[in-house]
Swiss-Prot record:
GO terms for biological process: methylation; protein histidyl modification to diphthamide. Keywords: Methyltransferase, S-adenosyl-L-methionine, Transferase. InterPro entries: 4pyrrol_Mease, 4pyrrol_Methylase_sf, 4pyrrole_Mease_sub1, 4pyrrole_Mease_sub2, Dphthn_synthase. This is Diphthine synthase. Homodimer. Disulfide bonds: none annotated. PANTHER family: DIPHTHINE METHYL ESTER SYNTHASE (PTHR10882:SF0), DIPHTHINE SYNTHASE (PTHR10882). HAMAP family: Diphthine_synth (MF_01084).
Length: 257
């Protein structure tokens, strides 16, 4: 049996009782933290909560050893952990599919993810369009996909959730400030007037913690704002319902007129 379990968003206290229960019965526990990471805890605290040692796999090992992991679950109970919800990343969906193809039982233990946590802004979840990711630019690599997604969602009046790059192996997490700078550079290149320094966005920091920060304001005002520790994400708002306008006013910190 293979158990795909989510650890939630922030710390070991997000772990569900069901996940703890299955962990105690598991023969072996693996985890990956390259698609998302819990910034409010440590591996040691998670192990203490689960009562088992965890083997951490990097991106290469997960992608290259998926078959090995699945074969191991033919006669053992193998748990595979990730931050957030286990079925958000395509890698985990692939594991579930391949296991099912081989007749292996698959148990999925859902958990809070950024897709549910952005509700703390008061924006209505059904009004979000396609999600996009902003990555650190590199030499000969500067994807403009986020710009295109914001553009298309905006045409339909949808909100856009922008996830920010995580390089856990380098302990490097893109800040909202860096993400906004990337988007402004793409705008400067494309010049399609999709966004500018007067565009209002929402920044969410440390969603899932007891003290998340939600800030609503113009990009120009947010560029130098200190949002604190990661993880951050950015939301471009679409057409706002009056209740959403009230939510942004009262639930978020407003820094622009």
């Amino acid at each position: 049996m293979i158990i795909l379990a989510g650890l939630g968003l922030y710390d070991e206290k997000d772990t569900t009782l069901k996940t703890v229960e299955f962990a105690k019965k598991a023969d072996k526990i693996y985890a990956e933290f390259y698609t998302a990471i819990l910034t409010g805890t440590t591996i040691e605290k998670i192990e203490e909560t689960l009562g088992k040692e965890i083997t951490i796999l990097d991106r290469e090992k997960v992608e290259l050893e998926t078959e090995k992991l699945i074969n191991e679950s033919k006669d053992k109970d193998i748990m595979f952990l990730t931050a957030g919800d286990p079925m958000v990343a395509t890698t985990h969906i692939d594991i579930a599919i391949e296991a099912k193809k081989k007749g292996i039982e698959v148990i999925i233990l859902n958990a809070p993810s950024i897709y549910s946590a952005i509700g703390i802004t008061g924006l209505q979840l059904y009004k979000f369009g396609k999600t996009t990711s902003i990555v650190f630019p590199e030499p000969n690599y500067f994807p403009e996909t986020p710009y295109d997604v914001i553009k298309e969602n905006s045409k339909m009046g949808y909100h856009t959730l922008c996830l920010l790059d995580i390089q856990a192996h380098n302990t490097r997490f893109m800040t909202a400030n860096e993400g906004l700078e990337v988007l402004l550079k793409i705008e400067e290149k494309r010049n399609e007037n999709i966004l500018n320094k007067d565009t209002k966005v929402v920044v969410v920091a440390r969603a899932g913690s007891l003290k998340p920060k939600m800030v609503y304001g113009k990009i120009g005002d947010l560029l130098e704002y200190d949002f604190g520790a990661p993880l951050h994400c950015i939301i471009f708002t679409g057409n706002l319902h009056f209740m959403e306008e009230d939510a942004l006013k009262y639930l978020c910190e407003n820094i622009s007129e």
